[in-house]
């Protein structure tokens, strides 16, 4: 998996940062895909600067209904329809996202020509496509807001083909059964247990993508042990009280969460427009002082998971 940041500003766009939108590129060898997390104003325009277009999207996850996370959605849906893309799309989000989509399309005389499914969610597991699971966590914000934890299923370990050949097992259908951990019976009556010839399973990658939030109990569960945590750092540590009053987090709080949750890496985003490049570097330094494995996202930054 890899993350492509389309927008990294908080509240309003700036000359260098658009509002929130993140692509998750699912780099599976046989079932690749592209998911979008939040869709602030101008998201479809930002996508023009990437290798992806709205027609490739399979799923969109909306954290909450504030405009800087949502107002790009109607235009993206309409453009996807105008392009004649027939592939289905599922939108996940809090209560009200269905009404928002229906109202904006109706009042603008617009429609979608592709199958559009809208899932209004609550906290808990919301998706398992056989390759990965998505769990939603309710966060602390003035509007109903969620963060999403995406965890790949573990991959089976490699089959020790050399040892199997030495045991008299020839490549073919039996190898497939053994790779699945099954027990097979050979022509001479011997039974071979696939588990005895498999390397340990490879743990799937994991990422936690937060919506806007002040510190809360659910945040630790959402982030616990993930490879990558994407979290807002709207304001610096000196403005922590103001950040929390508006349902946001400071640099210090975000980095502390990353440390307590034992994540692999922290990626900072959702930066207030008050900070220029020098100010952004100060935000980064505040986070790294607590959690060194921190990166600052810019528009079009790409990070592997």
UniProtKB/Swiss-Prot annotation:
Molecular functions (GO terms): 3'-tRNA processing endoribonuclease activity; exonuclease activity; zinc ion binding
Self-association state and partner proteins as the record states: Homodimer.
Gene name of this polypeptide: rbn
EC number: 3.1.-.-
Cofactor: Zn(2+)
Top-rank taxon, per record: Bacteria
Active-site residues per Swiss-Prot or TrEMBL entry: 68 (proton acceptor)
Keywords associated with the record: Endonuclease, Exonuclease, Hydrolase, Metal-binding, Nuclease, tRNA processing, Zinc
CDD domains for this protein: RNaseZ_ZiPD-like_MBL-fold
HAMAP family: RNase_Z_BN
Protein name from the UniProt record: Ribonuclease BN
